[in-house]
Swiss-Prot record:
Lineage, top ranks: Bacteria, Bacillati, Actinomycetota, Actinomycetes, Kitasatosporales
Gene3D superfamilies xref list: Alanine racemase, Lyase, Ornithine Decarboxylase, Chain A, domain 1
Organism: Streptomyces coelicolor (strain ATCC BAA-471 / A3(2) / M145)
Obligatory cofactor(s): pyridoxal 5'-phosphate
Catalytic activity: L-alanine = D-alanine
Any one GO BP annotation for this protein: peptidoglycan biosynthetic process
GO CC aspect terms: cytosol
Broad EC category: isomerase
Protein name as annotated: Alanine racemase
Length: 391
């Protein structure tokens, strides 16, 4: 690394940083494995590991016992396979979000497990396998009630299973898995949970009766891994829980499951100044100071993933006290009213973290923005350096 690059990176960290605690991630993976002792674990690292950094988090998860990695796009999966130093050869990597004309041949040659939900995808992956001269690893996805990706039950599923059997006989592919995804596993007692489990059992049983012999059957996402033992089957694939965030306040806090949030988002105050009462703050003057006060400028904005919907409501810890965003969050910055306190420029402002030092959590920001904690951590942008600790 050149001196100029090192200085630029150091300056960026001084402005703002997302600290990623890899020891917490490893502990979370171990806690999740204990929740599903009879199943293998797929660490879902899609969307740059929910904003935490895919390759460092993948390595940490594998070190803690994950034997599979999951991504949405094939590009994410190919990047994992190409990482240097490489992941262990026996770690399986699956990707599931395909569009026509995707990099099927590259995926086959990289030994990825690819999801197939429709006949067009079956035709493309078998064509890629024929061209590569290598059997594809295919997982058939069933729509058991989510109404999103996956093959519909009935005639569509029967055709897809039949096509997979014929391709296996030709040596073009191996069906390594049958899988699905829950719609409402984060809502305890929702009737769709039992209905989807029943449908999943029916659809996998049909495929196996026809002659498919998958290595794994899986449907358990984070909430199902944590609360639904009947859904664990051969493999669980937690995503958000691996990063120490609860899938939903309704099922419990991270601490209830022995999980610890992995990301801490902090910045250094760029400016601290005194203003009189009645002073408008930020665009539109949606906040006016109630009296003489101190304002602190936090150099993070919606370009960095701070949700504009949290204007006038997002919590921030400064000098040991919770403060609230004053007025609108702008593209690169927002303001907090510090009352009578006068911290020095450069003082730390913590937006969220585990919460055990008094700081807000990602869930607090989700409540302030009217969204879910998944979005809070995942949307933190590339302008914010990731700083890995406890590697």
């Amino acid at each position: 690394m050149s001196e100029t690059t090192a200085r630029r990176d150091a300056d960026a960290v001084l402005r703002a940083r997302a600290e990623i605690d890899l020891a917490a991630l490893r502990a979370n993976v171990r806690a999740l494995r204990e929740r599903a002792p009879g199943a293998a674990l797929m660490a879902v690292v899609k969307a740059d590991a929910y904003g935490h950094g895919a390759i460092p988090c993948a390595r940490a998860a594998v070190a803690a016992g994950a034997t599979w990695l999951g991504t949405a796009t094939p590009q994410e999966a190919l990047a994992l396979r190409a990482a240097e130093p490489g992941l262990p050869d026996d770690v399986r990597i699956m990707c599931w979000l395909w569009t026509p004309g995707g990099p099927w041949r590259e995926a086959v040659e990289a030994r990825l497990d690819v999801s197939v939900s429709a006949m067009w995808a079956m035709e493309e992956v078998t064509g890629a396998a024929r061209a590569a001269g290598v059997p594809a690893r295919v997982q058939l996805k069933a729509d058991t009630g989510l109404g999103r990706g996956g093959c519909q039950p009935g005639a569509d599923w029967e055709r897809l299973v039949g096509a997979a059997l014929r391709a296996e006989e030709e040596g073009l592919l191996r069906v390594t898995g049958l899988w699905s995804h829950f719609a409402c596993a984060d809502e305890p007692g929702h009737p769709s949970i039992a209905a989807q489990l029943t449908r999943f059992r029916e659809m996998t049983a049909y495929a196996e009766q026809r002659g498919l012999r998958p290595e794994v059957r899986h449907i358990a996402n984070s909430p199902a891994t944590l609360t639904l033992p009947d859904a664990h089957f051969d493999l669980v694939r937690p995503g958000i829980a691996m990063y120490g965030v609860s899938p939903s306040p309704e099922i419990g806090t991270p601490a209830d499951f022995g999980l610890r949030p992995v990301m801490t988002l902090a910045a250094s105050l760029a400016l601290v100044k005194q203003v009189p009462g009645g002073h408008g703050v930020s665009y539109g003057h949606h906040y006016t100071t109630p009296g003489e006060t101190t304002l602190g400028l936090v150099p993070l904005g919606y370009a960095d993933g701070i949700p504009r919907h949290a204007s006038s409501s997002g919590p921030v810890l400064v000098d040991g006290k919770w403060r609230t965003v004053a007025g609108r969050i702008a593209m690169d910055q927002f303001v907090v009213d510090l009352g009578g306190d006068r911290p020095e420029p450069g003082a730390e402002a913590v937006l969220f973290g585990p919460g055990d030092r008094g700081e807000p959590t990602a869930e607090d920001w989700a409540q302030a923005a009217g969204t879910i904690a998944y979005e809070i951590v995942t949307r933190i942008g590339s302008r914010v350096p990731r700083v890995y600790v406890n590697e």
